[in-house]
Amino acid sequence: MMTLLQSACASVLMTCMPAAGPQDGMALSKLIYTDIDTGFTQASLADVIDLISQTSGAKVVLLAESESRPNGIDASLTVDLPAAHRPALNLLQDALAACGSPVPCTWQVRSGMIEVSTKDQLSTESMQVTRILPIEEFIQPIPDYNDPPNLNLGGGGGGGTGGGAGGGDGAAWEDLETRRNQLIEVLISNIEPKAWKRAGGNWAEIMPYRRSLLIRGPRWVQRQVMGFDFLLPRVSGRTPRTLRFDGDQVRVEIALSEQLRREDNERAAQPH
């Protein structure tokens, strides 16, 4: 059986270059730039997902629990949310947070679709990809400027002893392996701690390779480490929106100018 390192190195061109096509960016962009102002009372999660899909025009697929998919999400879970003007992506995540699922659930972009289900279902072997994270800039040793080398620049005249360039005892530099392992610990401690095989999980694996890290895992984990592997298209005539990553949540933030413009339009539309 091929190890993760052998598999990743053998297929480096296929797995490490962006594999996602433009359809992935287009699908997510529809959820970012479509606003939905709807509240829900005891609405099934399936109905909420269907509304988001129809309103945004994106293909949002609920991978529900079934005989062939025992780890899928329970489509009959209900959602209670007050009406609020929010991007469709935020509504999707708010609905997942409000549905009361007994197991963690999330979403990911794959093959031009937004897939919604439990984290377990979205982490099956067929859902996983391998990506390489360059870490050169993170593991460069930082000089100790409080203990500079003695250049012996003082004194003058012939017959001096000359300037040595002593660099201290050499213990100020940590070796590459130590710094790399420290970075791995930081990653698995802060990004989905229960996902990593190193920590007893089953969803993601991370291992060093020279001055990079090989990470194999589902897309919803990969985006927390390296972001999306596709570009988000600009929407003509729209103020650009930003994304804020907060764990497995990706929140859409609307510029203040756009919010004020919408409020002005709403006031103008009210009868006087």
Name the predicted role of every residue range.
Residues 9, 16, 20-272:
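Outer membrane pore-forming secretion/assembly proteins and partners of Gram-negative envelopes
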Residues 1-15:
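Bacterial N-terminal signal peptides
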